[in-house]
Amino acid sequence: MHMNLFLKQLTHLVEDEENIIANLSNTSAFLNEILDEINWVGFYLFDGKELILGPFQGKVACIHIPLEKGVCGYAARHKKVIRVDDVHQFEGHIACDSQSRSEIVLPILVNDELKGVLDIDSPSYKRFTIEDENFLKEIVHIIETKIFM
């Protein structure tokens, strides 16, 4: 992956647009284009009590996710990145797509306040590496500073 180029492209894509939905929509489409072996990428936005489906690319998804459920809920509740090599081994996993095997979820935080999560699923086991995580942390940093600030 050409990480620095992708980061510059995303920054350019979102920096002059103020609409959050438009920016998150384009970000999910952008990630869907550049990431291999994924079957879902998108956002869940925190409404103060639960995660609500936001812009995404992939099959129809669960609309409401309580913070006590699933990989997304765990990442949101603990405000930390979680990589799951095998979602079927994750207690409380919410199976929106039975084809998903691994998942990475990154919280979106502004001044330590939860705004939502970036969720990416793959049909491959152990799809997401530490390199992917570090790259996606940079993506989330752009989201936090260019979209939610």
State where each predicted segment sits.
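Short hydrophobic/aromatic beta-strand element in the GNAT-like acyltransferase core
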Residues: 40, 105, 117
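Sensory-domain boundary capping and coupling elements
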Residues: 109-122
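Intrinsically disordered, low-complexity terminal regulatory regions
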Residues: 1-54, 138, 143-149
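A short, aliphatic-rich beta-strand micro-motif
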Residues: 102-109
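Short loop/turn motifs at secondary-structure junctions and domain boundaries
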Residues: 35, 96-100
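Regulatory sensory and allosteric helical modules in signal-transduction proteins
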Residues: 46-96
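Regulatory loop-to-helix N-cap segments in sensory/regulatory domains
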Residues: 121-139, 146-149
